[in-house]
């Protein structure tokens, strides 16, 4: 990027974006392919269909791969497959990479959507569907011990489940049938904060929670238990500790994902 004087910026935790347009990236890659200063010498065929790939041990090393294309047959010492995966089929994604791997007896991890929103049972999700559009920073994790994965990122509520950077990241590690644990207020010890507030605050618990989580989320949470629908000073220690536990380690078991169309 710097070599080609393309201005860019960090938008969010390592996510880099061009200041002008992604077209700058395309032109950079084309320049590198065309042999710009310190660049390569690449012949580019576009469009060009792939018909078949064959391999022969008997052929000279530089010609062991024979590739039949829409623009003729090519011989090479190696073939690089950079086809991408199954994500977003509407733009033409196919399973050709997996088929080629199978053809040459390469081990393939069973493919499944990654970096994808997670969905939940409609009935179980009903209390939270009203939060659609709400975003907040969280700590989200899945797995245990050696398989534990955790991310501190933003979460987004949707009508069908959860999305946002944190959920997209954790989706690559979540296994069907296992749970997620979400800390909705990762910057504070909620149990300690609520106990401290109990000593002097006459605010409703929901209003007290507004200091740490969005008001819509606080209202939704306290509506689940009458013990939380009162001034914090009148709440029992047990009720406050349970509330803090639910908000700090919210257990959820997704039923699935939005699939390859959103991956």
Q: What spans do the regions from the language model cover?
A:
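Glycine-rich active-site loop/strand segments that organize a redox cofactor
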Residues: 2-12
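Short beta-strand to alpha-helix junction loop
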Residues: 12-31, 45, 88-92, 119, ...
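Flavin (FAD/FMN) cofactor-binding core of flavoprotein oxidoreductases
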Residues: 19, 23, 114-123, 250, ...
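A conserved beta-strand/loop element that lines the FAD pocket in flavoprotein oxidoreductases
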Residues: 33-50, 111
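A glycine-rich dinucleotide-binding beta-alpha-beta segment and adjacent secondary-structure elements
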Residues: 45-47, 223-263
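A conserved short coil-to-beta-strand element within the FAD-binding core of flavoproteins
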Residues: 46-63, 116
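Short hydrophobic core segments
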Residues: 50, 74-93, 100-102, 154-160
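An anion/pyrophosphate-binding glycine-rich loop and adjacent beta-alpha core
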Residues: 106-110, 116-238
């Amino acid at each position: 990027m710097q070599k080609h004087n393309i201005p860019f910026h960090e938008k969010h935790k390592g996510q880099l974006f061009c200041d002008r347009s992604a077209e700058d990236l395309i032109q950079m890659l084309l320049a590198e392919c065309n042999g710009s200063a310190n660049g390569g010498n690449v012949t580019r065929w576009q469009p060009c269909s792939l018909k078949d790939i064959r391999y022969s041990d008997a052929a000279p090393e530089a010609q062991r791969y024979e590739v039949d294309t829409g623009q003729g047959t090519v011989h090479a010492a190696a073939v690089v497959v950079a086809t991408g995966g199954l994500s977003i089929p509407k733009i033409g994604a196919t399973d050709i990479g997996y088929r080629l791997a199978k053809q040459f007896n390469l081990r393939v991890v069973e493919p499944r959507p990654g970096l994808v929103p997670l969905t939940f049972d409609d009935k179980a999700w009903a209390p939270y569907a009203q939060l659609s559009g709400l975003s907040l920073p969280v700590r989200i994790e899945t797995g245990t011990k050696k398989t534990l994965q955790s991310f501190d990122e933003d979460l987004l509520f949707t009508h069908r489940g959860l999305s946002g950077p944190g959920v997209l990241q954790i989706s690559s590690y979540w296994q069907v049938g296992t749970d997620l644990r979400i800390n909705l207020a990762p910057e504070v010890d909620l149990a300690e904060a609520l106990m401290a507030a109990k000593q002097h605050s006459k605010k409703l618990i929901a209003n007290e929670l507004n200091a740490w989580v969005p008001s819509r989320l606080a209202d939704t949470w306290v509506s689940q238990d009458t013990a939380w629908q009162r001034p914090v000073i009148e709440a029992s220690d047990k009720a406050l500790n349970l509330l803090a536990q639910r908000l700090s380690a919210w257990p959820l078991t997704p039923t699935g994902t939005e699939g390859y169309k959103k991956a």
